[in-house]
Curated annotation (Swiss-Prot):
Pfam families assigned: Cytochrom_B_C, Cytochrome_B
Protein name: Cytochrome b
Family: Belongs to the cytochrome b family.
Residues noted as binding heme b b566 in the record, renumbered to the chain: 98, 197
Function: Component of the ubiquinol-cytochrome c reductase complex (complex III or cytochrome b-c1 complex) that is part of the mitochondrial respiratory chain. The b-c1 complex mediates electron transfer from ubiquinol to cytochrome c. Contributes to the generation of a proton gradient across the mitochondrial membrane that is then used for ATP synthesis.
Keywords: Electron transport, Heme, Iron, Membrane, Metal-binding, Mitochondrion, Mitochondrion inner membrane, Respiratory chain, Transmembrane, Transmembrane helix, Transport, Ubiquinone
Keyword hit for Metal-binding: yes
Source organism per UniProt: Ficedula parva
SUBUNIT field: The cytochrome bc1 complex contains 11 subunits: 3 respiratory subunits (MT-CYB, CYC1 and UQCRFS1), 2 core proteins (UQCRC1 and UQCRC2) and 6 low-molecular weight proteins (UQCRH/QCR6, UQCRB/QCR7, UQCRQ/QCR8, UQCR10/QCR9, UQCR11/QCR10 and a cleavage product of UQCRFS1). This cytochrome bc1 complex then forms a dimer.
Cofactor annotation: heme b
Transmembrane regions: 34-54, 78-99, 114-134, 179-199, 227-247, 289-309, 321-341, 348-368
Residue positions binding a ubiquinone: 202
Annotated GO biological process: mitochondrial electron transport, ubiquinol to cytochrome c
InterPro entries documented for this protein: Cyt_b/b6_C, Cyt_b/b6_C_sf, Cyt_b/b6_N, Cytb/b6-like_sf, Cytochrome_b, Cytochrome_b_C_euk/bac, Cytochrome_b_N_euk/bac, Di-haem_cyt_TM
Length: 380
């Protein structure tokens, strides 16, 4: 009998084991779609990014004009640019929902998968930051100046680090050149580490909404979840194209339509919406080093989540007290995002400080305590 090529070919069998014959829990919901949506986001960003890179010039005197030229004179350049800029927003929407899903259903107990995922989040944030600098508008320039300057808060070596990152004594041509190099490189690093993320995931298999072992009831990934994923792709791409065609500048900053000018500071320097929660935490601490540490902690705290799991149950499905805390955390992040976009004045300062404090309190203190309380109440 002829061998089944799909199951025996060295290359095809890897793809088969990951996308076709993969045993998958039969009860996973639409919240499990976001992993594959992130894959589609990455592919979309790499393809549109490569097309943009063919017309972009990484030079301070030419960068802004090269982007304008792309939108005016290149066939469908406006569309490619709008898809790329808004694709970043969709990337972050998907990754935040993906992390929220992992948090809610206890997927972080697959520790290696979770930790690699946090590394992927950090890489994505780095990529988005250096990418935002490339059009060399006002907010690009001042965003780069403010955020790279945070390195100077590091004692003793801070100033040296900043000048090393800048390639000079201010954000200038060397900075733009290296940021373009990094922005080109990092998505491919993300693609590589995504494979590591998947490898670790397939060691244990997917979690499910009940948070219980599902080995007794698994179904093949294809055709069930492949079909479900394609529906997700269609819905997301429809939303992305709608945003890129109807309201491409909705999420951008009008300040970035002005070419970078080192002599004029914009009235409100703020990052893109997906960084506002961290920016609000940074601003809520009146000390520079303290702010930088809080900014780093706001994302790095995710590494601690598996260590703080005190419940005897994996998921929050049957834990109402922790559910209330979870949604309080979501609301808290939305408040931080809103405050991050507001000017630094009363009452936004105190709102930001309280929201920052409650962000860390909920994750580091209240979640572990609530889980212990629930264990007691359920006599576990």
């Amino acid at each position: 009998m002829a061998l089944n090529l799909r199951k025996n070919h060295p290359l095809f069998k890897t793809i088969n084991d990951a996308l076709i014959d993969l045993p998958t829990p039969s009860n996973i919901s639409a919240w499990w779609n976001f992993g594959s949506l992130l894959g589609i986001c990455l592919i979309t960003q790499i393809v549109t990014g490569l097309l943009l890179a063919t017309h972009y010039t990484a030079d301070t005197s030419l960068a802004f004009n090269s982007v304008a030229h792309m939108c005016r004179n290149v066939q469908f350049g406006w569309l490619i640019r709008n898809l790329h800029a808004n694709g970043a927003s969709f990337f972050f929407i998907c990754i935040y929902l993906h992390i929220g899903r992992g948090f809610y259903y206890g997927s972080y107990l697959n520790k290696e998968t979770w930790n690699v995922g946090v590394v992927l989040l950090l890489l994505l944030m780095a990529t988005a930051f250096v990418g935002y600098v490339l059009p060399w508008g006002q907010m690009s320039f001042w965003g780069a100046t403010v955020i790279t300057n945070l390195l100077s808060a590091i004692p003793y070596i801070g100033q040296t680090l900043v000048e090393w990152a800048w390639g000079g004594f201010s954000v200038d041509n060397p900075t733009l050149t290296r940021f373009f190099a990094l922005h080109f490189l990092l998505p491919f690093v993300i693609a590589g580490i995504t494979l590591v993320h998947l490898t670790f995931l397939h060691e244990t298999g997917s979690n499910n909404p009940l948070g219980i072992p599902a080995d007794c009831d698994k179904i093949p990934f294809h055709p069930y979840y492949s079909t479900k994923d394609i529906l997700g792709f269609a819905l997301m791409l429809i939303l992305l194209v709608a945003l890129a065609l109807f309201s491409p500048n909705l999420l951008g900053d009008p300040e970035n339509f002005t070419p970078a000018n080192p002599l004029a500071t914009p009235p409100h320097i703020k990052p893109e919406w997906y960084f506002l929660f961290a920016y609000a935490i940074l601003r809520s601490i009146p000390n520079k080093l303290g702010g930088v540490l809080a900014l780093a902690a706001s994302v790095l705290v995710l590494f601690l989540v598996p260590l703080l799991h005190t419940s005897k149950q994996r998921s929050l499905t049957f834990r109402p007290i922790s559910q209330v805390l979870f949604w309080a955390l979501v609301a808290n992040l939305l408040i931080l995002t809103w405050v991050g976009g507001q000017p630094v004045e009363h009452p936004f300062i105190i709102i930001g400080q309280l929201a920052s404090l409650s962000y860390f309190t909920i994750i580091l203190v209240l979640f572990p305590l609530a889980a212990v309380l629930e264990n007691k109440m359920l006599n576990l």
